Amino acid sequence: MDKNMQGKIVKGISGFYYVHVAGSGIYECKAKGIFRNQKIKPLVGDNVTVAVLDEEQMLGNIEEILPRENALIRPAVANIDQALVIFAAAKPKPNFNLLDRFLIMMEYQKVPVTICFNKCDLLTGEELHAFSDVYEQCGYPVVYTSAREQRGIDALLERLDRKVTSVAGPSGVG
């Protein structure tokens, strides 16, 4: 069967790529060898053309990777609308060097970034704004949350609504 469809890679595991095709579902696909020969690795978020091998079993081959809007190495994703960088406001103390590196990486890829400081219940408002104001003055939206107290969650969800978002940050941010 020579039926080609376009879709988006939603998951990649051990050389298998799961491609969501609107109106049809998710196809399990392998990438053609030409990608390996050209050292091109399909990424989650890639828009692709799939040659359907078995419509009933929903199997196919990725024939083409369409042009990417952006691509990140860690996490390995493409065509995202934005990034959410989450850091703890305290416990552990934020590593601003690491946060700045995240921001530089996203700026280089032209990916809009929202910074989320979690555990804001552990600091006073004055302490929190002492470091977060710097990022807001640079034009980065900053969201303050407390997962423990369920504060700021609605504001965070509003920023994520209807957007493909890559989430990054160190461990221990809550």
Give the ranges of each region predicted by the language model.
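Short, well-ordered coil/turn elements that cap or connect secondary structure elements
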Residues: 24, 57, 108, 137-139
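Residue-level signal for inorganic ion chemistry
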Residues: 45, 106, 118
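Conserved catalytic network of the ASCE P-loop NTPase/AAA+ motor domain
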Residues: 75-78, 107-109, 159
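Conserved beta-strand/loop subsegment of P-loop NTPase cores
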Residues: 80-87, 109-118, 139-145
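Residues at alpha-helix caps and immediate loop-helix transition turns in enzyme cores, especially N-
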Residues: 95-98, 127-128
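Histidine-anchored nucleotide/phosphate-binding helix
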Residues: 97-107
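Canonical P-loop GTPase G-domain recognition
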Residues: 121-173
